[in-house]
Amino acid sequence: MGTEKNEPMGAPIAVSPAIPAECDQSMRNETAAASAPTPGRGKKRAMAIGIVIGVLLVLVVAGVVAIKVANSSRTPEAQVRQYLDLLAAGNASAATAMVDPGVANDQRTFLTDGVMASAQSRLVIEDVVADRNDESSTRSVTATMQVNGERFTHQFTVTKAKPTMGVLDNWQVKDALVTQVSVDAQGYAQFTVGDESADAPKKQVTGEGATFFFYPGVYTFTPVAPSEYVDSTPVTVAVLDVVHRTNTDGDASDVSLLATYNNNLKDAALEAGTKIVDSCASIPGNQNSVCPFAIQSDALTAISVKTMPTYMEPLKTDPGAFQGHVTFTATYSNKYYMEGTRDVDTVLILDVQFDSDGLLKLDQDGKPDFRVSFAR
């Protein structure tokens, strides 16, 4: 028999060595142990989550508390007190910005810091109390205050405004604490309060003068003297929620500025009187219609002044009228009168004149204009 040759059928196949059963089971156990969570790691994760939740809760509670604390100072009465604090401090500009006075700009002349700085007394706050309608969007707040020791109350209307960031309360005071003061004048064209001035309306026979607005306080109204013949006589009033004045005339203004005339006017009256007396004591000056009738004659042959007034006395009923005693010595022919020389006693009266605005009328030389007459 021939020898058979065995030819290879293909590439040899590699065979992994067999793993013992004990080793295989051990590897499986290690893999399972690695993939399973350990008790310590899970506990740490739970603690971290708990801490985060706790912090968030603390922040939420703190935020709620902070909002409540903030809103506790954003109440209707707090808003009113803030407004009154500005007035008490004389901060008129900030008070006006906070609560609109509700008047035209040309009526706000005296609602300024400078005017309030001039006040002898300003607002003192005693108490501020809101009503109990806590859920209402419109609240009533009553403030008790003083000016110069005089107590008064004022009720404010406060309305709820749009909240800030949706959570912080806002309130708006609707009515400003301003008071109307009526002013009239006789003999003055202007007056000042503090560093502000205004035209002084002429005093009327009846009714009140022009109206101006003021914040509470004690103010001095100082008239501006139009000439050297007029003194400036100030008037001081207490402005609360109404004006506390000394006059009781219901038709009178709160402030009446009445001109007072000084010695310069008396001197001017004497000077003017002396000139007219000298004129009447001359011929033909004696025939001037203002001269005493007894010396207005062409039968007068001589005239002189026997007694010249040295002082012109103001009339009690009219401080702008003056009088003085004059004696002329006149000599007559027998044309109309009994011939001879005799004294003519008379009273010189000078009335100062006023223009249409009630101001002292002056001539082109700046001297007072007088109407001259003789009583007899």
Predicted regions located by residue number:
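Structured interaction patches on ligand/partner-binding surfaces of diverse proteins
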Residues: 226-261
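Core segments of small alpha/beta cavity-forming domains
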Residues: 69-115, 260-301
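Intrinsically disordered, low-complexity Pro/Gly-rich regions
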Residues: 1-44
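Short, low-complexity N-terminal intrinsically disordered segments enriched in polar/charged residues
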Residues: 30-85, 256-270
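Extracytoplasmic/luminal low-complexity segments enriched in Pro/Gly and acidic/polar residues
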Residues: 247-376
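Short solvent-exposed beta->alpha transition segments
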Residues: 92-151, 287-315
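Short Pro-Gly-centered beta-turn/loop motif in secreted/extracellular proteins
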Residues: 204-228
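Exposed beta-sheet edge and beta->alpha loop/turn motif
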Residues: 131-207, 322-375
